[in-house]
Amino acid sequence: MLKKLSNGFNPCAKNRKIENGKWKMENGEHTMNDQPNSQLSTVNSPLIPPGYKLTEVGVIPGDWDIIKCKDLCEKIQDGTHFSPKLGGNDYLYITSKNIRYGNIDLKNIERIDTFQHKAIYKRCDVRYGDLLLTKDGANTGNATLNNLQEEFSLLSSVAFLRFDSKKNDAHYFLQQILSKQGQQQIKEAMSGNAITRLTLEKINKLTFPVPNLPEQRAIAAALSDVDELIAKLDQIIAKKRDIKQAAMQELLTGKTRLPMRMENGELKMDNAGNPVRFSGDWEVKRLGDLFAFSGGFTASRDQLSESGYCYLHYGDIHKSGKSYIDIDAEYINIPKLAIELNRINSSALLKDGDVVFVDASEDEEGTSKHIVVINPNNRPYISGLHTIVAKCKTDDLNNEFKRFCFQTRNIKEQFRFFAAGTKVSGISKTNIAKIELYFPSKPEQTAIAAVLSDTDAEIAAFEARREKTKLIKQGMMQELLTGRIRLIENGKLKREN
């Protein structure tokens, strides 16, 4: 199914096919526009395909129904509206921060004592298999199924939906809620509210296209298969990142020395036939001896657009999953600032090999966030608000080595030591200059950077595969959850050849 859908396969296309986002009959007549929110107007409606009907949520199969959440569920309830005292280590206390897209995150879970839990659970008795939906805050609309066998308490920021299992499959409705159409419906339900919130009343009124139970299960199974593939890719990526982190800790501290290579790329061997490894002591210098530091040009996010000169906002450094930015490769996606270049101090214009640090972070881990600029063609690139630009004063460091050398545990601990502030951690140019960096000879820097770059390339390949799989799933959701592709025929599961 995954392979066929990725190639545009449509198992229901006996007398119609999808062409340019529209259904086309064999006689060439287009029948239905593929509208993103599936809200088709009853005014001037196009011809409805045979076996389909027009409803308030769009065109769906004739044997499907449109049903509100309150009529699908045995119970819909949110958690406690009174914050309990944390501690006691008896029962898990789950809030919206623990509900992710399709899973429960227990990394930073809190616990409460038995007395408080019993009082909460009496009203909000969430069970295994219930659907958990965030209803407050920035994560509103995130949902997952409860896969925990133990009792736990919920905060009011999360509601649970208990579907009638004799008629409805919770896995199917999880996919409906997480779909583009489901998220749009939630967004519209929250419109007009000063605070981002989804009330129980609004949840009860959420409306979904509903096939019979066998087809619900077939659709949920097909989409769950893709979810499993995405989860496996996530695991591989996480493992690769752990391997990279361990390799950096070994290679960037000199604990492990790499074998040397000759100019032709072959390993250098000693007389006994063993690889010759790099040796010798590493240098240590303060960053102030290696770099000249300066600030960026202040401009708000609102001033940025798609025209002008490339502009590096400190928020984009925080959000980046990389330690470098390639101007030529990423030019289209880099925000621009429309400004006369002579208004920008030359120290704020980023050159190839410059390192840019953030000077403020909401958490300690973010205080060492940085990127290395790859700009061989010297495109104008402006370093922005809350950035500290580091320009080399010496040729001690390779540009490729810079991408990794600031990611060691030792460097991060020094950043945390010099950072100041409570809610927001900040670091000054003066304090960054005091940080000490250990580094090897330039040939060894090159060898280290090559090994770590290869690992980065592997991670990037898996990330690209994951993103492609996610796009395929989005296409599957659009087709399966609206009935454009049917997995059930004459009441029986279709079998692929």
Give a label for each model feature.
Residues M1-F9, V57, G62-I66, F173, ...:
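Amphipathic alpha-helical segments
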Residues G8, R16-P50, P259-F278, I488-N497:
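Short, basic, low-complexity termini and linkers enriched in Ser/Thr/Gly/Pro
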Residues K17, E26-G28, P49-D78, K205, ...:
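Non-catalytic DNA-recognition/assembly elements of restriction-modification systems
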Residues P50-G51, E151-V158, N168-A170, Q183, ...:
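A short glycine-rich beta-alpha junction/loop motif
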Residues L54, I60, T80-H81, A119-I120, ...:
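Short, solvent-exposed loop/turn positions at domain surfaces
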Residues D63-I104, Y121, T140, V284-D326, ...:
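Low-complexity, Lys/Gly-biased intrinsically disordered segments
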Residues T95-S96, I112-L178, H313-G315, E330-Q407:
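A short beta-sheet element
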